[in-house]
């Protein structure tokens, strides 16, 4: 079900699902993420968001995806808030994310939530924007 969603959602944003390479972690989400949520409309996944632990004080926002038909309804904001609240309640001090400069809507959402641009913190060769949110101040 998740893989079907990703096969539909990723191409909407110009990405391709690579389960044997950069997206292999989707085959073992419980090992890779500390939290992973799916948003449903009836029995269909329409959005996802996840949190990955970087260390005891830092986590990373991952896999914030929403089918295009569901954009503009506040659902992306709800998914983001779910992850941020989880990060706060789990005791993380900072939440990082990486993205693409072409993902204008996503970047606007992140900035509205309080994320600011930071230095590159990982080796993701597919990302060109790196952001951080101070969770201690986001409450």
Where are the regions that the model predicts?
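Acetyl-CoA-dependent GNAT
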Residues: 1-63, 67-68, 80-82, 86, ...
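Conserved hydrophobic/aromatic "anchor" residues
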Residues: 48, 70, 109-110, 115
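Short coil/turn segments at alpha/beta junctions that flank glycine-rich nucleotide-binding fingerprints
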Residues: 57, 73, 89-93
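Active-site acidic-Proline motif in GNAT/NAT acetyltransferases
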Residues: 67-73, 101-102
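Residues forming the Rossmann-fold NAD(P)(H) cofactor-binding site
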Residues: 73, 77, 81
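C-terminal "cap" of GNAT-fold acetyltransferases
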Residues: 93-96, 100-113, 119-139
């Amino acid at each position: 079900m998740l893989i079907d969603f990703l096969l539909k959602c990723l191409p909407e944003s110009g990405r391709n699902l690579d389960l044997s390479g950069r997206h292999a972690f989707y085959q073992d989400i419980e090992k890779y993420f500390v939290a992973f949520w799916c948003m449903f409309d009836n029995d269909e996944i329409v959005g996802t968001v996840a949190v990955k632990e970087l260390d005891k004080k830092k986590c990373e926002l991952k896999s914030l995806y929403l089918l295009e038909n569901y954009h503009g309804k506040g659902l992306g904001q709800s998914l983001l808030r779910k992850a941020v609240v989880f990060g706060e309640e789990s005791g993380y001090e900072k939440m990082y994310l990486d993205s693409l400069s072409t993902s204008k809507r996503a970047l606007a959402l992140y900035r509205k939530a309080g994320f600011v641009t930071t230095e590159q913190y990982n080796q993701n060769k597919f990302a060109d924007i790196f952001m951080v949110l101070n969770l201690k101040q986001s409450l």
